[in-house]
Amino acid sequence: MSDYKIWVDADACPNPIKEILFRAAERKALPLVLVANQMIRIPPSPYISQIRVGAGFDVADQYIVDHVEPTHLVITADIPLAALIIEKGALALNPRGELYTVDNIKQKLTMRDFMEDLRGSGVHTGGPDSFSQADKQAFANSLDKWLVRV
C-alpha cells in the first residue's frame, strides 16, 4: 500500500472532490497530499497532508511533477500538468472523472492550445460547465476503479 499515493493540485480542486478524497484516504489508509499555494482545510488524519508552496506560476504543479512516481495518482484539471504526469508514468484524473491517458492527452493539449489562441484573439469561448452532481459521481466512480487496483 505504501507505494501508492494520491496527489491533488488543490488550489482549483472543487471541495466536493476533496471530501471524496478525504474519505477514500481514510478508508484505504492511503497517503493523500494536497499541494497548493494557499492553506487548504484538511481533516486531522495520519493519511492526509498538505504541502504549501510559494506563490508563482505553476509552482504547485512543479512540486507535484518533482515528487510523483509511477504508482501515484494525480488529481488535476490542468492539462499541461496531466501531460507531465503521464510522461513520468503516473496516472492523472480530472475532477470530473476523466482519466488522462497517453492516447488522449495530445488531443486535449491541442484543444486547450486552440481555445487559448481563440481567447487571445478576442473570441469569447465561454468556460467549462458548472461542476455538477453527475461530475461528482463520475469522479467517485473513476477513483473507485483506481482504488480497486491498489
UniProtKB/Swiss-Prot annotation:
Signal sequence, start to end: none
One Pfam family of this chain: DUF188
Top-level division of the source organism's lineage: Bacteria
NCBIfam families: PRK00124.1
Sequence similarity: Belongs to the UPF0178 family.
Name used for this protein in its record: UPF0178 protein Sbal223_2514
Protein's organism: Shewanella baltica (strain OS223)
